[in-house]
Amino acid sequence: MIHAGNAITVQMLADGIAEFRFDLQGESVNKFNRATIEDFQAAIAAVKANNDIKGLIVTSGKSTFIVGADITEFGENFAQGEKAIVDWAMPVHDIFNSFEDLELPKVAAIN
C-alpha cells in the first residue's frame, strides 16, 4: 500500500500502474470535505515520492464517483467575508493543481 487514508488509498496494481481510490470511510458518498482534502494532499505526496508509479487509475469505492464539495462546511467561511473565503479556497485550489501537475498519465475509471 502506497497510501492508506480514511478517504483515499493508493496501491500498486501491476506494471507501474497504481490505483488512486476515493472511498470516504463512514460516509455513503465521496465528497470533498476538509478530511478528504487533507488526505488528498497526503496521497499526492505519496505518489510523488514513489518512483515506481508510471500511471494512475482514479477510481471510487462508492456507487457515485464523487458528489463534489461538502457544502455543510461552507457556512462558517461565508459568514467571515471575502478574505476568509479566499484564504480557505486557494490552498484547496493548489492541492488540485498539484494532482494535475503529477508528471504521469492519469485515467478516471467511472462506471
Feature names for model-found ranges:
Residues 59-60, 109:
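Generic beta-strand/beta-sheet core signal
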Residues 60-95:
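Glycine- (often His-adjacent) and acidic-residue-rich active-site loop
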Residues 17-19, 66, 107:
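Structural preference for beta-strand elements that scaffold enzyme active sites
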Residues 1-59, 83, 94-97:
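Conserved CoA-thioester-binding segment of acyl-CoA-metabolizing enzymes
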Residues 93-111:
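Glycine-rich beta-to-alpha active-site loop
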